Amino acid sequence: MRIISGALKGRSINFLKNVNTRPLKDSVKENIFNILKHSNLIKVKIKSSNILDLYSGIGSFGIECISRGASKVTFIENNLNAVTILKENLIQLSIINRSEIHIKKVENALTNDISEKFHVFFFDPPFKDSSFLQNIKLIQKKKVFKKNHVIII
C-alpha cells in the first residue's frame, strides 16, 4: 500500500493482513480527495486543516491527509494491532509530530478526550457498526467542528 499524492507520494505504508480489518482502497481515497478539492459546495481544503480520523485502523486516510498538507491528524482506534501498525507508519514516515493517537472506542474518546475543533471528520467504521450515528450527534453536541467543516462516512 502506498501514499497516493503529496509530499509523501509513493512511500509505502504497512497494513494489517487479517479478515477483520481492511485498508481503505486507493480508488476510494482518490475519489474523496477529488471531491474535496474540486467541489464548489465544500469550503474545506485538506491543506492546513485539522483532521479527525475516527475508526482509523492503520491510518491510511489520515496519513494521506498529512502528505497533502494537513496541519494535524487526530487518530481514534481501539484495535491494538491496528494502532501498533499506525504508530510504525507514523514513525517510519517521520510524521508522528503532526499526529495524535487515542487508543479507545470512538465514543469514549469523543466524550472524554476531544475538545479541539476540526475541519474534516472521517468515519470508516467496521461494516456492522452503526455507532457512528451516535458519534455524529456527539460531535454536534460538543461543537468540536470549525465553521467550515465536512463529515465523510
Predicted regions and their residues:
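Class I S-adenosyl-L-methionine-dependent methyltransferase catalytic core
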Residues: M1-I153
